[in-house]
């Protein structure tokens, strides 16, 4: 101790086993009885602690090293923490600067950083402005939403904030969009994301917003539907096309949601087994649909409901110059069981027949019977090797071309689910 300049220092080993500690900034607490050991040195000036250096600290589930500097009122003014580990955190380096106006600057780098504390209006963020700069292989943004990359932003005194995300955004640990630049806004109750990046190696636009009652919405747009659907692990048989995909989530677990998909001007390069099976009926032109560049479609629409592992295909339909089909049913990812029923019509063949059949106008007006040349099909069993059933009587049965071509032609023919057969 220098009595003239009133400065000095020392070291200490502290046993905190019986202590209770709460760090709301990291949503962490230690209860009495948990392990607590700290090796530290300290400097003081004018009878007040000026700096504490922690050589090693193991306190409950927290461990790390750090240097803490104090203001004249003994509040922390600056802190540098290294090798910090705690539930939700694996930080190589954390730097915190607290300015005279109580605004906070936070810089962190490491393998795992839980950023959800930034959205809590209690504790460290209450009535403070915060700016942050995080870089990590795993930035936890919300439940089941993480970012690999960099997050820079700020929060005002009311708890509302904005941020820029650069990197790969993941949903449930699966990449959603890569090499992305996304703008975000958030507070304690909601968040919105909007930006561009790569899905399946092609550029896509993504937007996300939380809605009322714990619901949220995800919208994806792309000029290359095929690559985007592959990147989202939805479908791998489509090539080209323009995509609009919308998910409306019913809860915060993202396991109960409605999906709407619309694809225009695309090809199916490997026809479903139901279409391939129709070739045995020797219908003119059908076999060519599964060869070469695939089947061309002008538009395809899918409405799918997800409840846990169940995928309920409410209506999946597509139409082009050569063929039109609609199907509905259900798939269970846990059991791999599939139950689908639908209709398929080779429109090029219908067009040829219309040209040679008398009284075409009467046929087109139709009746409530099975459509002319509309083939019913059903798939059931395991998705990897489904059992396919064809109703050949519908191929030659008299019926209604108008019904085949109408938007709701599947309503009377399909709409089954797995549990309807139990």
Give residue spans per PLM region.
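Polar/charged alpha-helical tracts
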Residues: 82, 92-93, 116, 156
